[in-house]
A protein has these predicted regions:
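A generic "folded-domain core" signal
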Residues: 20-157
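Sec-dependent signal peptide recognition
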Residues: 2-9
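Basic, ligand-binding patches in group-transfer machinery
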Residues: 12
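N-terminal signal peptide c-region/cleavage motif recognized by signal peptidases
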Residues: 15-18
Length: 157
């Protein structure tokens, strides 16, 4: 009777230890129609790219970026009051607060294309640098090899 408890305890401990990703390494997961691409840095800032397959009322796929700051505060690119800008390869990519309009969609696709090739990037919230991420080109190209669902902003059956 003790052996099953030991196996269960070992399984729980193993799954808990794999839940925390190493800094500067992309991880991904899918659940409830959303693919998440997550990276953290040594300072404990987490960058979470959310690519949804769930359209809004206008059949727009409202992808977003969530940031969790070291103090536990979260900010979201969908918040009209928050400006998130990602800097990659000496170019800045301001994230639109919503998609479904030409300039916002174009800005989002440019951001996704650049992110898929970024060896490192900086993130700013309202013009204040909140994090630097350095996954390296090899990790980025492996983990973000297919961001096609993140590039699509309009839902179609």
């Amino acid at each position: 009777m003790r052996l099953p408890h030991c196996i269960l305890t070992a399984a729980i401990l193993f799954s808990a230890s794999t839940a925390h990703a190493l800094p500067n390494m992309w991880t991904s997961g899918f659940g409830q129609g959303v693919t998440e691409y997550i990276i953290s840095n040594p300072e404990k800032t987490e960058f979470n790219l959310n690519c949804t397959t769930n359209p809004d009322e206008q059949n727009i796929l409202q992808h977003s970026v969530w940031l969790t700051l070291p103090d536990g505060t979260s900010v979201n690119s969908r918040d009209n009051e928050t400006e998130i800008t990602v800097v990659m390869d000496n170019s800045q990519y301001p994230l639109p607060s919503f998609l479904g309009w030409r300039n916002g969609d174009n800005a989002w696709v440019s951001f996704i294309d650049a992110l898929g090739q970024a060896a490192n990037f900086d993130v700013y919230v309202s013009d204040k640098k909140v994090g630097t991420f350095s996954p390296g080109l090899k990790n980025t190209q492996k983990e973000l090899s297919d961001l096609s669902e993140c590039r699509t902003t309009h839902y179609s059956d």
